[in-house]
Amino acid sequence: MSDHQDGMKLEDIERQFLDVAQREGGLEAIQPTTGPLENEENLKSSTGGGGGEDDNDRKKRKRSRSRDRDTRRRSRSRDRGERRGGGGGGDRDRSRSRERRRGGGGRDEPRRRGGDDEARSRREPEPQKPREPKKYRFWDVPPTGFETTTPMEYKNMQAAGQVPRGSVQSAVPVVGPSVTCQSRRLYVGNIPFGCNEEAMLDFFNQQMHLCGLAQAPGNPILLCQINLDKNFAFIEFRSIDETTAGMAFDGINFMGQQLKVRRPRDYQPSQNTFDMNSRMPVSTIVVDSANKIFIGGLPNYLTEDQVKELLCSFGPLKAFSLNVDSQGNSKGYAFAEYLDPTLTDQAIAGLNGMQLGDKQLVVQLACANQQRHNTNLPNSASAIAGIDLSQGAGRATEILCLMNMVTEDELKADDEYEEILEDVRDECSKYGIVRSLEIPRPYEDHPVPGVGKVFVEFASTSDCQRAQAALTGRKFANRTVVTSYYDVDKYHNRQF
């Protein structure tokens, strides 16, 4: 009875496994050739029936059936694992395809999404920051107390007399010895054979003191360099004023030779600047001479220091006098004389007709009947600046000439030259359309006309007039800008 029951139980278990296999669709994987019951009956028949079996035989059969069940169970587990993706590459690929179509990404999805984000970030540029106003390197160092005031607002305040006295910076630019080197040197030619630097240095220093030209104790001349092969020398002074005074030694006799004293070739009169070591007082009495100039049309609110600053943009003054009334207020005109006579014509050409506030300057020789000294310059001041002084600043044209802005040394370096070009173009573009811009540059040892001047061509005369009114009197590299109109034909023919 117990054997029969065991057989029935095994048959029920096997049937349950077959039902599960059919539902899984893998019946073919578990088709047993003989069931447990058949095996048992065959075993019984081979032994002559079940009655003669002993306990050992039953135990062996039970262990055998258990092993068979375990084997079949492991086989079915492997089959189900393969069908569910454990070993089927095709099913796994189809599963991933379904996931991608449904929006899933599997293991590679985070990496793919990261790539999309990266591509999207490349396609979508970052929002640009608002462009800050350009800070010019050269234009307008604002006076103390007016750091937040625009140049145009400051000029309008000046015209209205709203700028208090003493608010303008010192007229003496802050420059070092290297900047003024060319203005502190003199060329000495026809030097005697066999002279040495020490002897020449002692000779000139002695003559400076004997003639009363030294403006302070000590040696006015600091350095002497002799070129014996070409028979000339260069002497370097401690101050610009004493350098100018040293030109009086042209023709002096030294060791039997008559010396030639000249300015060096790279000297530019309009770019003369102060040496900080020389702060000699300017005489307040301007004596009548061929180089005395009259400055009229001055706004009454301008102080003496402000007028001197304007004049000193061309070079140091020998004497200056601003006419005032009994209350100390300006009468609107002044007289001046430059320490270097060669600057007289240049200053007249640059300042005459300049617009200051609501007034226009009138600058001319004060003593026209006096005989002029030979300054080695053309007699006509208009030939210096290329304008007609009889018409003030000249007839308005599309060409604006800006003077007293740049030095020859500043134009030699390419990077600095490009920066100056950019600064001037950007500033002039605020007042109209700039068609072209010319800043003549020095070329080795060859003289180039117009070096030190800036020429700007505007699209219309009205644009040029707006720029002229706005830029006159402005500061560029700590120099006061002087402006005038320029002939269109001369500009296009490059007659600078």
Curated annotation (Swiss-Prot):
Keywords: mRNA processing, mRNA splicing, Nucleus, Repeat, RNA-binding. It is found in: Nucleus. CDD domains: RRM1_U2AF65 (cd12230), RRM2_U2AF65 (cd12231), RRM3_U2AF65 (cd12232). InterPro entries: Nucleotide-bd_a/b_plait_sf, RBD_domain_sf, RRM_dom, U2AF_lg. GO terms for cellular component: commitment complex; nuclear speck; nucleoplasm; spliceosomal complex; U2-type prespliceosome; U2AF complex. Residues 1-26, 78-96, 105-138 have a biased composition (Basic and acidic residues). This is Splicing factor U2AF 65 kDa subunit.
